[in-house]
Amino acid sequence: IAAGCNIITTSNYYATPLILNGMGKKYNYLELTKVAIELAQKAVDSKNKNVMIAGSFPPINISFRPDLIPSNNQLIDFYSSISELYINNVDLILCETIASIQEAQIASKIALENFHRVWLSWTVRGIDFKLLPSKELLSDAVKNLSKTRIEYQLVNCAHADLTTEAIKILKEHTDNFGAYANSSIYDPSKDSLENYESVDEIHHHHSNEINCSDYLKHVTECIALGAKVVGGCFTTRPE
């Protein structure tokens, strides 16, 4: 907030029942989500600025792994339960790092049933900005959700250079788009894709960290392309 943002996101990205159970943690995801809401509200109140709070609808399981998404009923129960906590406590819902059309449809349906303002952010398949981790085309995904009243469609948690390319696809199918990338760029000199077993490995092993000025160049390009929302994701910092 001190650095100038006008939206912050609740920090409950990994507070999901499947992730906590997989880590052997005894914490309750709903209790952790309540804490995340309270911390976001305190941050906004302490700065006395006009800053919105986005309630996070995170992936229910490990990021970039749509193959680990459970049944539709489990997704519905998860998003419905955190929706109840967000009502009257956040300004909008952000369905983020969405890896498949199935996940997007369920998360957005629950969000739209309970909130007026809903944003949805896709992520891409490793180094291929044209695909979701599910191997579905990003263009098909954007077109599918364009039929709803989602306010903005975004791309997040991908290399800054690939994110810039991905929003060109968003631009073809919606006027309201944006991005919040990682502070990294794709490094083609790293091992070939065949050496990695999962999309998650591809995502993190083909990266070179970039500094603030280099990140700014990518954000500026996104704005020039027409992005109406820009920000930062993995490893970005206030500066």
Where are these regions (language model features)?
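Domain-level signal for soluble alpha/beta catalytic cores
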Residues: 1-239
